Amino acid sequence: ITTVLYSQLHALDLTRYNYFISFRSLYVKDHPERMERLPDGVGIYPLASEMNMDLLTIAAQLLKLKGHAGSWSECRLHTAYRREWKKHFGSTEFACVIHYNGYEAYTTALLEEAPCPRSIWVHNDMAKEVHLKGNMNAHLLKEAYHTYDHIVPVSEDLIQPVVSEFGADRSRITVIHNCHDFQSVLE
């Protein structure tokens, strides 16, 4: 996914909008050279701290991940993630946010609370990923696919699992194929 992200960033007109990449700092700590591949003009918002949760919020999170969340726990989690949004981004106004890799529970829940249009990309059959690899939570994905404004699979064959397994609204799905930076391959 990282290679495709770099390719898509290089294909964008970076003078038309301000683009920012946000990532958890610990993911690039061991490979800082990854940041050198970002095109000039792309800003960064590193997320340097972990989420602070009290015991009730931890309990609400565990209930949600098991599919047993009720209104009190949902309210508590949304409040906690809105607080996280403010902690990381302050009063910065974004025209939209894109959860590009579509994985990781924290980022999925954090961007769900963004006060602007939200898009989540789908690079793989997430139903298979959940069942075979266990690398994402089905309950969290279902909520994300119901609340994000746009769901963006990278191929047509990924639409059906998103709709049938997670109940996503077909009208919010737009396929955008991966972009490959052929220039850097030729170089």
Q: Which role does the model predict for each range below?
A:
Residues 185-187:
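A short helix/loop element that forms part of the nucleotide-sugar donor recognition site in Leloir-type
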Residues 81, 99-105, 122:
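Short His-centered aromatic/hydrophobic patch
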Residues 56-73, 120-138:
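Acceptor-binding helix/loop patch of EC 2.4 sugar-transfer enzymes
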Residues 83-92, 134-153:
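Membrane-proximal helix-turn-helix segments that form the acceptor-binding/catalytic region
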Residues 114-118, 148-149, 169-172:
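A short helix->loop->beta-strand "cap" motif at the edges of active sites that frequently abuts
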Residues 1-6, 27-29:
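A short, glycine/small-residue-rich beta-strand->loop->alpha-helix junction that serves as a flexible
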Residues 157, 176-179:
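Carbohydrate-associated surface elements
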Residues 11, 16-70, 158:
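N-terminal strand-loop element at the rim of the active site
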